[in-house]
């Protein structure tokens, strides 16, 4: 990896290609050169200078690759925080639904106890303490009328 440095805004501005584009183009027409010039390109070729230039170019390309990698990964890192917040929100909602389930479970236990008490009271051996069916039904309807809004609100919160 290359050295750590701040992310550039425009990667193309720092490349060697851009520097080459800034130089004015020169056109040479064959046959218009000086006759004294030797056209052998291998005569002026310095292999050490070429290798040093290629190392610099390779290092520059590695830096550009690192910058592109960082710029491509940056949105993913931002999305990780959103995913974490979303999962925390789901955990909080799940915790709330567990509380609602506990409340509904306690209501069901209360209804079961009420039913057992009514049945025990109904089967009482003492005929003077008997309750008529109309009184029991009226009491159950009143209880249902009181608990229906509470249960519908709990169900609404559970499904929310």
UniProtKB/Swiss-Prot annotation:
Keyword tRNA-binding attached: no
Q: Where in the cell is it found?
A: Endomembrane system; Mitochondrion membrane
Residues of the site described as Cleavage: 153-154
Q: Where are the transmembrane segments?
A: 136-156
For region Leucine-zipper, the annotated ranges are 137-158
Q: Does the keyword Manganese apply?
A: no
* Location, primary (coarse class): membrane
Provide the topology term for how it sits in the membrane: Single-pass membrane protein
Print the keywords alphabetically: Apoptosis, Membrane, Mitochondrion, Transmembrane, Transmembrane helix, Ubl conjugation
Fill in the PTM field for this protein: Proteolytically cleaved by RHBDL4/RHBDD1. RHBDL4/RHBDD1-induced cleavage is a necessary step prior its degradation by the proteosome-dependent mechanism. Ubiquitinated by the ECS(ASB11) complex in response to endoplasmic reticulum stress, leading to substrate recognition by the segregase p97/VCP and degradation by the proteasome.
**GO biological process: one example:** positive regulation of release of cytochrome c from mitochondria
Name the PROSITE patterns on file: BH3
Alphabetical GO CC annotations of the entry are: Bcl-2 family protein complex; endomembrane system; mitochondrial membrane
The record ties this protein, via Pfam families, to: bcl-2I13
User: Where is motif BH3 found?
Assistant: 57-71
Supply the domain comment: Intact BH3 motif is required by BIK, BID, BAK, BAD and BAX for their pro-apoptotic activity and for their interaction with anti-apoptotic members of the Bcl-2 family.
Function description: Accelerates programmed cell death. Association to the apoptosis repressors Bcl-X(L), BHRF1, Bcl-2 or its adenovirus homolog E1B 19k protein suppresses this death-promoting activity. Does not interact with BAX.
Its assembly, as annotated, is: Interacts with RHBDL4/RHBDD1. Interacts with BCL2L10/BCL-B.
Q: Which PANTHER family match?
A: BCL-2-INTERACTING KILLER (PTHR15018:SF1)
Listed name of the protein = Bcl-2-interacting killer
The record lists the organism as: Homo sapiens (Human)
